[in-house]
């Protein structure tokens, strides 16, 4: 798998460029059937090598997942438990390996929307470069690239360690279907969470660049030379940036909804297992099962943080800084009526349309999901 520096920029947006390693990982895992044209632009083709690979991989792992669930359901419970807890245990087994079968199906239908979203990023970058300046070669993007590459390499190391640990686990080493499906499911969930995290980092860097450029303009010009045209350019760019961030709820609505519910279920089951069986597992010295529950709890709780709060605090700080800059601009001097109106509209736009990276109560995600469902009727 490649890193950022190995992926040609061409006419791709910096968002596409930074997330390139994760798209490669999705393609290898068979969850995202896409190709790239001569300019490196992301696109989906129904008939292509990538699509055939995704279909064959999906069919193979669909069967493997069914066989793995069947195998796990027949295994005796690790300790004595009630019928209700047996059902929960089997449900937990199924939840663990479900992503290997379901996520490729969901992503197959959302790849086209992802392509459209990347195109919107390309259009946004054109306006961003015109108003703010070319971001691709700045020190800030170099720093972000290094940060993203560290995240990507950390994921690879984590998956290698996890794969070795699962391979030596007594509950999976005897069944190839369980082993392969478990590793693929964990890989899919980790890379999707990482992709979401990188998206938050890119948005944070974009807003920060916007804020710094606005600050530079204020320091360079006196208030009378900061014209209505410049203010309007900043306002329209802000609105476009806000729509782009909230568009996350449309382009991967079903995928991220599945991931959030999946991680929530795993967290709840892990807490339940530790609360009900933790003391018993320690007494019986079943440290393997205890460690598995703890790792599942920590990892999935981290994923929930990434989905629901990651990036919010940082982008909120940037947004608040922009608001303060506009208030400073508004109070610099007496403005003409037209300029004062433009600044007021700008301030209202920043207050009402804040591109914060979060999923408040699933609103943004399920808004897109509900729209997709209603469009079918």
Task: Annotate each language-model stretch with its function.
Residues 1-146:
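N-terminal signal-anchor/initial transmembrane insertion module
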Residues 1-57, 149-153, 224-377:
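Terminal membrane-anchoring module of integral membrane proteins
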Residues 58-97, 123-198, 211-229, 270-302:
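Helix-loop-helix junctions within predominantly alpha-helical proteins
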Residues 93, 97, 120-123, 127, ...:
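Charged, amphipathic alpha-helical oligomerization/scaffolding segments
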Residues 103-124, 196-210, 301-328:
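Inner-leaflet juxtamembrane helices
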Residues 106, 132, 136, 218, ...:
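Long, hydrophobic, amphipathic alpha-helical segments used as structural scaffolds
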């Amino acid at each position: 798998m490649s890193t950022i520096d190995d992926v040609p920029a061409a006419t791709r947006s910096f968002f596409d460029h930074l997330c390139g390693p994760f798209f490669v990982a999705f393609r290898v895992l068979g969850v995202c059937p896409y190709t790239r044209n001569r300019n490196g632009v992301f696109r989906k083709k129904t008939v292509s090598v990538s699509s055939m690979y995704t279909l064959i991989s999906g069919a193979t792992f669909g069967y493997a997942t069914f066989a793995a669930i069947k195998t796990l359901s027949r295994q005796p419970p690790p300790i004595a438990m009630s019928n209700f807890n047996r059902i929960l245990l089997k449900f937990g087994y199924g939840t663990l390996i479900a992503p290997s079968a379901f996520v490729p199906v969901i992503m197959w239908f959302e790849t086209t929307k992802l392509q459209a979203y990347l195109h919107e990023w390309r259009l946004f970058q054109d306006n961003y470069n015109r108003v703010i300046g070319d971001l691709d070669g700045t020190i800030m993007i170099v720093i972000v690239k290094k940060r993203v590459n560290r995240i990507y390499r950390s994921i690879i190391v984590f998956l290698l360690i996890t794969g070795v640990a699962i391979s030596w686990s007594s509950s999976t080493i005897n069944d190839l279907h369980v082993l392969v499906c478990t590793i693929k499911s964990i890989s899919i969930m980790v890379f999707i969470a990482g992709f979401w995290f990188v998206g938050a980092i890119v948005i944070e860097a974009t807003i920060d660049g916007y804020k710094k450029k606005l600050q530079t303009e204020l320091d360079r010009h006196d208030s009378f030379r900061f014209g209505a045209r410049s203010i309007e350019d900043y306002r329209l760019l802000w609105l476009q940036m806000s729509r782009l961030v909230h568009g996350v709820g449309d382009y991967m609505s079903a995928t991220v909804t599945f991931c959030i519910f999946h991680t929530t279920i795993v967290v709840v089951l892990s807490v339940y297992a530790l609360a009900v069986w933790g003391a018993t597992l320690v007494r019986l010295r079943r440290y393997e099962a205890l460690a598995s529950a703890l790792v599942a709890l920590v990892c999935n709780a981290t994923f929930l943080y990434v989905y629901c709060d990651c990036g919010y605090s940082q982008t909120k700080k940037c947004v608040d800084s922009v608001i303060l800059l506009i208030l400073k601009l508004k109070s610099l001097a007496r403005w003409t009526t037209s300029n004062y109106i433009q600044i007021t509209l700008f301030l209202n736009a920043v207050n009402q349309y804040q591109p914060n990276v979060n999923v408040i109560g699933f609103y943004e995600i399920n808004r897109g999901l509900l729209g997709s469902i209603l469009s079918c009727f």
